[in-house]
């Protein structure tokens, strides 16, 4: 009985702590200190996006990687030695980092905003903006995060989903951050504007098993197309669009592709091949509105993961260095 009481107290404390942290995140957090923060960031992101489309997938992926390691505290942005030196982060495109840097520079040019907005919040805003720029849903971004002071290679180990993951592995990892299976599937939908390097999926098209060189869950025509784009013994760093039908548009085509066996990673295709998640894929494939609403909910929850607020952390003067 005593143990049960202790557990209940701990559980209540965790709920109270989580609620108090989330309560400190507000969409109008900078209304007095930097009232034009969203406009300034949006304009900087748009300018960067006009230079290269890679801005969009790079920024989205950067946000996800940041939040899944130590929480959404911009620790991924810190200079080496840091998280970005881990093999799972070395493929992060430089355009994502540059997007945040450009937005930070734009804010610092405004005397009212200089060193007032955290790099973590800049990344969260930039992520929303690239989603909108590619045709995705607009949504309010909760703000008030503080920047972390620690970033290590070791912290990335076993913290990010792998291309070979099956459903249970995906669910377990996302559940650690308070994200449901539906959240996980909705966030996977961001792959509609993503790209991947040949080395991340070559096993599926060349040596899946001794008897089956091609993964049987993979559409055979799609597999042969991938072989043409990723010839054997050629540079494994060649980048391939994860959505072969509308790679530059944030839509629900990703889920329609899964129905056809055209998920690039095992972790993509398993969302349809596993009957436990198939109905959600079918729902998102049949209704873009349903997907968009689920994505808004999921990315809002993602943006709350492990946030530092109040007096925790700092507001970095340089996003790549602690103060």
UniProtKB/Swiss-Prot annotation:
Q: Where is this site: Transition state stabilizer?
A: 61
Query: What CDD domains would the database entry show?
Result: secretory_peroxidase (cd00693)
Q: Which Gene3D superfamilies match?
A: 1.10.520.10, Peroxidase, domain 2
What the entry lists under InterPro entries is as follows:
Haem_peroxidase, Haem_peroxidase_sf, Peroxidase_pln, Peroxidases_AS, Peroxidases_heam-ligand_BS, Secretory_peroxidase
Keywords of this protein's UniProt record, alphabetized? Calcium, Disulfide bond, Heme, Hydrogen peroxide, Iron, Metal-binding, Oxidoreductase, Peroxidase, Secreted, Signal
Please give the catalytic activity noted in the UniProt record: 2 a phenolic donor + H2O2 = 2 a phenolic radical donor + 2 H2O
Q: Which GO terms describe its cellular component?
A: extracellular region
Binding positions (Ca(2+) 2): 192, 243, 246, 251
A single BP term in Gene Ontology: hydrogen peroxide catabolic process
Name any cofactors this protein relies on.
heme b; Ca(2+)
> Can you tell me which residues bind substrate?
161
Tissue expression, per UniProt? Expressed in the whole plant, but preferentially in roots and leaves.
Q: Where is the signal peptide?
A: 1-23
Query: Which Cys residues form disulphide pairs?
Result: 34-113, 67-72, 119-319, 198-230
Q: Which residues take part in binding Ca(2+) 1?
A: 66, 69, 71, 73, 75
Instruction: Tell me if DNA damage is a UniProt keyword of this record.
Output: no
EC nos: 1.11.1.7
Superkingdom of this protein's organism = Eukaryota
Q: Which residues bind heme b?
A: 191
Q: Which family does it belong to?
A: Belongs to the peroxidase family. Classical plant (class III) peroxidase subfamily.
| Function, as annotated | Removal of H(2)O(2), oxidation of toxic reductants, biosynthesis and degradation of lignin, suberization, auxin catabolism, response to environmental stresses such as wounding, pathogen attack and oxidative stress. These functions might be dependent on each isozyme/isoform in each plant tissue.
The protein depicted here goes by the name Peroxidase 16
Q: What is the lineage of its organism?
A: Eukaryota, Viridiplantae, Streptophyta, Embryophyta, Tracheophyta
Q: Which gene encodes it?
A: PER16
């Amino acid at each position: 009985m005593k143990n049960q009481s202790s557990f209940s107290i701990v559980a209540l404390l965790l709920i109270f702590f989580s609620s108090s942290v989330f309560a400190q995140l507000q969409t109008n957090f900078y209304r007095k200190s930097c009232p034009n923060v969203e406009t300034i960031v949006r304009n900087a992101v748009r300018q960067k996006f006009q230079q290269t489309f890679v801005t969009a997938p790079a920024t989205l992926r950067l946000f996800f990687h940041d939040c899944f390691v130590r929480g959404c505290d911009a620790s991924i942005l810190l200079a080496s030695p840091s998280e970005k030196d881990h093999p799972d982060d070395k493929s992060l495109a430089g355009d994502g980092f540059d997007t945040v840097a450009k937005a930070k520079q734009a804010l610092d040019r405004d005397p009212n905003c200089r060193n007032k907005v955290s790099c973590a919040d800049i990344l969260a805003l930039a992520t929303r903006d690239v989603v909108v720029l590619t045709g995705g849903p607009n949504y309010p971004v909760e703000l008030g995060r503080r920047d972390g002071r620690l970033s290590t290679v070791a912290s990335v180990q076993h913290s990010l989903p792998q291309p070979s993951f099956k459903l249970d592995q995906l669910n377990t990892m996302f559940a650690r951050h308070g994200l449901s299976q539906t959240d996980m599937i909705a966030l996977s939908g961001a792959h509609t504007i993503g790209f991947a390097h040949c080395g991340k999926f070559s096993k599926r098209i060349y040596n899946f098993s001794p008897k089956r060189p091609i993964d049987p869950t993979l559409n055979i025509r799609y597999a042969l197309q991938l072989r043409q784009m990723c010839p054997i013994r050629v540079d494994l760093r060649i980048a391939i669009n994860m959505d072969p039908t509308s790679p530059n548009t944030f839509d629900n085509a990703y889920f329609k592709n899964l129905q056809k066996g055209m998920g690039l990673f095992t972790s993509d295709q398993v969302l349809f091949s596993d009957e436990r998640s198939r109905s959600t894929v079918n729902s998102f494939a049949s209704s873009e509105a349903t997907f968009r609403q689920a994505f808004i909910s999921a990315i809002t929850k993602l943006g709350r993961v492990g946030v530092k607020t109040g007096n925790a952390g700092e507001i970095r003067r340089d996003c790549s260095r602690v103060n």
